[in-house]
Amino acid sequence: MKTTKLLIPTQKEVPNDAQIISHQLMIRAGLISKLASGLYSYLPMGVRVLHKVENIIRQEMNKSGAQEVFMPVVQPAELWKTSGRWDKYGTELLRFTDRHQREFCLGPTHEEVITHLAAQYLRSYKQLPMNFYQIQTKFRDEIRPRFGVMRSREFIMKDAYSFHLDQYSLQQTYDVMYQTYCNIFDRLSLDYHAVLADSGSIGGDASHEFHVLAESGEDTICFSDESNYAANIEKVSFLKQEKTCKSTLTEERVLTKKKNSIEEVAEFLNVNKSDCVKILIIKTKDGFKALALRGDHELNEIKAHNLFGNFEFAIDDEIKNLDLKKGFIGIKDLDIDLIVDYSASVLCDFVCGANEWDYHLMSVNWQGIEFVDADLRSAVEGDYSPDGKGKLIIKRGIEVGHIFQLGTKYSSAMKVNVIGESGKAITTTMGCYGIGVTRIIAASIEQNYDDKGIIFPQAIAPFQVVIVPINYNKSTRVKALSDKLYQQFIGAGIEVLLDDRKERAGIMFADSELLGIPHRMVISDTHADNGNVEYKARDKIDKMQMKFDDALSFIQFKL
């Protein structure tokens, strides 16, 4: 392909609304164009990258034995009402009414549609297991679309759904899909971790997320420095610890006037935050609860939700009505249930509030205090790994894939039953497997860039090689050699871009680097005099000269 025949609207300026590097570079490199908030058009270079990502996914999914289907984006409300999600899904579900006053939605996911389809055509246990996938547009009416295609309203996903006779069969397919996802992300050259995860609004049992490591990631993931353990911070669990407190100190009431935060109290009393206990008051369906955590730990709200159901933090007036002093709440004289995090329950001679304005207690212990201990906190860097091997490292991650064991949540609601070997109807059990196709492009850029632009992995670069001829439109020798090399590459099946524009060399170099094309060949009159071409890899600083006749074999070796 020649540059003059392509739309590549590169730009120097960083868009004002582009906060993260992938958004900035995708706009600047002319991969995408913003239509409205959370809506983007893919331009020719972006489409080339998108298709390469899709092709890798499609190849690996086909290899796994999954069958490709293609389902409508527009979905009837009846299906969502049958599954129970029409009211539960919330405002992200874009609903509308057609001219006949029938309700529909734009699909953010396709569990309802695939189960409706399966209920029509899966009749016998002999047909199972079956795994269907599609690569399709989704729509979620995000309240705050941001970060370009990372969190847009319209996006492309690969979603797959498997149907099984029993849990054993589901586990087999789940394991196959886990490995398939690893194969996909390996081929995409992503630095990723598969982590234990929460099932979220889709629901279900076992669940893994696949996260690309990047500082711009919205999720926090934890992994061991010595083992394969990895989990979303929401899912890192801690075991109950043995209590070994043998205190010989006397409890002391101290004046801490106007010092009502852990940081202020610890500094004032010259103690570590880890030697303090803080109390949070929450409101649940069963009334108010007091949660005690170590001063340097934070409440994991997912764990709290799993323990208490929906809850809210108590507001100032509610705390006052409980006869508690905000900022000075302690573990004594509480008239509400006290739940203590495991790590706080083993503290000895600690600091906590005195339930009295401007006072704290020192050398406090748990003897005589009625409480229940539980796993309440979020992990912190340096915690021992839950598998007992090594310590936890905490990084930011971009979720690019998620696999679930759904069980019978949807197949039961949608009546996806088959006749078993005994002749009786059996409700199928399901798995669900998603990959954010468009998000992968942004995630890859977040890991592969420099101050000049994108450094695409070879597998998804828009072109494999760019030829940059100096004075292509002025020097007949340069034009002849460039055209010859261009034809050689095309003949060898190499995806090559020839920059035939009437531009300065600096502009052509800058654009090729911005676009992230892995290999660059430069031809000038000087090179022609010596029968050479100049080669530079996008991810390297050094350049090298080689004979023109060796250029094709050299690139073939690199590819």
From Swiss-Prot:
It comes from the Bacteria. This is Proline--tRNA ligase. InterPro entries: aa-tRNA-synt_IIb (IPR002314), aa-tRNA-synth_II (IPR006195), aa-tRNA-synth_II/BPL/LPL (IPR045864), Anticodon-bd (IPR004154), Anticodon-bd_dom_sf (IPR036621), Pro-tRNA-ligase_IIa (IPR002316), Pro-tRNA-synth_IIa_bac-type (IPR004500), Pro-tRNA-Synthase_IIa_type1 (IPR023717). It is an enzyme of class 6 (ligase). Catalyzes the attachment of proline to tRNA(Pro) in a two-step reaction: proline is first activated by ATP to form Pro-AMP and then transferred to the acceptor end of tRNA(Pro). As ProRS can inadvertently accommodate and process non-cognate amino acids such as alanine and cysteine, to avoid such errors it has two additional distinct editing activities against alanine. One activity is designated as 'pretransfer' editing and involves the tRNA(Pro)-independent hydrolysis of activated Ala-AMP. The lineage of its organism: Bacteria, Pseudomonadati, Pseudomonadota, Gammaproteobacteria, Candidatus Pseudothioglobaceae. Pfam families: HGTP_anticodon, tRNA-synt_2b, tRNA_edit. Its EC number is 6.1.1.15. Keywords: Aminoacyl-tRNA synthetase, ATP-binding, Cytoplasm, Ligase, Nucleotide-binding, Protein biosynthesis. Homodimer. The keyword ATP-binding applies. Belongs to the class-II aminoacyl-tRNA synthetase family. ProS type 1 subfamily. It catalyses: tRNA(Pro) + L-proline + ATP = L-prolyl-tRNA(Pro) + AMP + diphosphate. One of its GO terms (cellular component) is cytosol. Consists of three domains: the N-terminal catalytic domain, the editing domain and the C-terminal anticodon-binding domain. It is found in: Cytoplasm. GO terms for molecular function: aminoacyl-tRNA deacylase activity; ATP binding; proline-tRNA ligase activity. GO terms for biological process: prolyl-tRNA aminoacylation. The keyword Cytoplasm applies.
